[in-house]
């Protein structure tokens, strides 16, 4: 099954690479999935990031097309995760799936246990790059 093109900024990619090298994450299946996403991603500088792309620290509204549920979450690094009702770790399967997608994109993504989900990005309520916050 083909996946939509994803765009990741160089700073996010570097930080995720460092995260994935940590022993706590290196052996996890999600680490392999994130590495594969980084390998296929188009890279750009934070300043060149299109304003409709889900980046780290973006607040994204998305729909689970499997059950129709709509959620709004801020995509964060695990160390910044404080509230699962408002945040989503990039090391969570859904967080990894959303990274780099554009508004309007949808993706099929495998969850733990072999279950698949189908997600659609509806809106970016905040993107650091669009706000000029290039170092978040």
From Swiss-Prot:
GO terms for molecular function: DNA binding; RNA polymerase binding. It comes from the Bacteria. Transmembrane segments: none annotated. One of its GO terms (biological process) is regulation of DNA-templated transcription elongation. InterPro entries: GreA/GreB_C_sf, Rnk, Rnk_N, Tscrpt_elong_fac_GreA/B_C, Tscrpt_elong_fac_GreA/B_fam. Pfam families: GreA_GreB, Rnk_N. Disruption phenotype: Mutant shows a significant reduction in the level of Ndk. Belongs to the Rnk family. May act as an anti-Gre factor. Regulates the level of the nucleoside diphosphate kinase Ndk. Can restore alginate synthesis and Ndk activity in the aglQ mutant of P.aeruginosa. Contains a short N-terminal coiled-coil domain and a C-terminal globular domain. Interacts with the RNA polymerase. This is Regulator of nucleoside diphosphate kinase. It comes from Escherichia coli (strain K12).
């Amino acid at each position: 099954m083909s996946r939509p093109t994803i765009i990741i900024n160089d700073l996010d990619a570097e930080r995720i690479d460092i995260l994935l090298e940590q022993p706590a994450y290196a052996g996890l299946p999600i680490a392999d999935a994130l590495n594969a996403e980084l390998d296929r991603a188009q890279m750009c500088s934070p300043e060149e990031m299109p304003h409709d792309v889900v980046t780290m620290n973006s607040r994204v509204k998305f729909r689970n097309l499997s059950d129709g549920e709509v959620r709004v979450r801020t995509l964060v690094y695990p160390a910044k995760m404080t509230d699962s009702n408002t945040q989503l770790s990039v090391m969570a399967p859904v967080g990894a799936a959303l990274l780099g997608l554009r508004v309007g994109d949808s993706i099929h993504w495998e969850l733990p246990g072999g279950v698949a989900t189908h997600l659609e990005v509806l809106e970016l309520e905040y993107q650091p790059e669009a706000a000029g916050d290039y170092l978040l």
